[in-house]
Amino acid sequence: MAKKNKPTECPAGEKWAVPYADFLSLLLALFIALYAISAVNKSKVEALKTEFIKIFNYAPKPEAMQPVVVIPPDSGKEEEQMASESSKPASQNTETKATIARKGEGSVLEQIDQGSVLKLPSSLLFENATSDAINQDMMLYIERIAKIIQKLPKRVHINVRGFTDNTPLNKTRFKSHYELAANRAYRVMKVLIQYGVDPNQLSFSSYGSTNPIAPNDSLENRMKNNRVEIFFSTDANDLSKIHSILDEEFNPHKQQE
């Protein structure tokens, strides 16, 4: 009677199971990442963070909430470029205050303890969602803002702040949201200088996609976050005067009286 052959034992035993399990974990993480970035929204990003914490026992660092740059204006670069942006037909000078105000519909003036903030949607100011070129139709409105600033006390400091949403900057010349926001704030500041605002009163900041005022989960909210803010700050003695002047100038009901 023939002897039964004993089953061949693997000399490595079950050592293959450990790297195989690691491989499956990495593969799972990859598919989770691909799924999340296919349609980015806040809930999916949070789910992705949770899965990475579970798989790798790693907690992602929170985004910085401080501006990347606060830069006072330089001497005279891009003067010719900004001059071409500010050029407009003479017929536009006959437009009434009400017409100019309509160009700024969508802007919001808020009074705060430190001063006032004028919020301007980027969709109003710039040619498209990833551009830093100011819309020519908005030049008269920015000129009006400059004239209002010139009525304020010289002690008032104006900081032009750029913000974006979190939409990926694919196929653009900007390497980051900070760069896009900085360029936009700088452009608005240069136009204000072009229209007579004292450069010593001005600076600009870039916050990139940080400090959103609404969740980036819809087109409407992303449009709110994609903005330029003009922040007026001064000491307590001038606050009431600033509030009064800005409220009178930017309140459409008072303009019609």
From Swiss-Prot:
Cystine crosslinks: none
Membrane topology according to the record: Single-pass type II membrane protein
Biological processes annotated in GO: archaeal or bacterial-type flagellum-dependent cell motility; chemotaxis
Keyword terms: Cell inner membrane, Cell membrane, Chemotaxis, Flagellar rotation, Membrane, Transmembrane, Transmembrane helix
GO cellular component terms, A-Z: plasma membrane
Coiled coil: none
Compositionally biased spans, kind Polar residues: 83-97
NCBIfam families: PRK08457.1 (NF006285)
Task performed by this protein: MotA and MotB comprise the stator element of the flagellar motor complex. Required for the rotation of the flagellar motor. Might be a linker that fastens the torque-generating machinery to the cell wall.
Subunit structure: Each stator complex is composed of 4 MotA and 2 MotB subunits. 2 A subunits and 1 B subunit are thought to form a single ion channel, so that each stator complex contains two channels.
Protein name: Motility protein B
Species per Swiss-Prot/TrEMBL record: Helicobacter pylori (strain J99 / ATCC 700824) (Campylobacter pylori J99)
